[in-house]
Amino acid sequence: TADEALVFSDGEDIGITYTLSDDGKLVISGTGSIADDAFAGNTKITSVVISEGVTGIGSGAFTGCTNLTSVTIPEGVTTIDGMTFGNCTSLTSVTIPGTVTSIEVQAFWNCSSLTSITIPASVTSIGSGVFQGCTSLTSVKLSEGLTRIGDQTFGRCNALETIEIPASLTSIGNDAFKNCAKLRSIRCYANSSTWQPRYICD
């Protein structure tokens, strides 16, 4: 078959294996973390299922997988690293589990087909540019527990019309909603008395 198998190891006998089927479904199993840039630029991949036991996803692991449409991330993963799914322009669906605590810089940058995202209550920090250039994003749910939004986190989200900011938020970066042309309503439950206009949008 066209199935492939590969083992990544961090030198401590922690291995990750994968199978890639003819229809582009990538199934990842084992224990430990997926290596940085492990599948970067692989245009054969159309869907990713990560099994429980995997605890980390390396920086840029799936960046530029332009035919990837859906991703399932298991309970146990705590961080989505920088540029993990950056420039996955066909990605429409991603499930973020309740064990993730941080989403790092540009993790979903330029995922231009992504239409909605739910950030679970476990996430306390969303890095700079995480959803920048997600031009089809219309629905975002930010849960209570989130404390930080980075610079330009939702920059160029041209389809985003409304968003609610939870009371737990204490820090918001510059131009968090820069160039969100259709954004008409920001409902803020946090104490925003010290925030300047540049923190939100231009």
Where do the protein language model's features map onto the residues?
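Membrane-proximal C-terminal cap and juxtamembrane stalk of leucine-rich repeat ectodomains
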Residues: 2, 196-202
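A composition-driven surface/loop motif
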Residues: 13, 33-41, 201
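Intrinsic-disorder/low-complexity loop/linker signature
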Residues: 11-12, 24-25, 82, 151
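Low-complexity, acidic Ser/Thr/Pro-rich repeat tracts that form intrinsically disordered stalk/linker regions
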Residues: 1-16, 22
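Structural signature of tandem-repeat unit edges
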Residues: 21-32, 43-56, 66-79, 89-102, ...
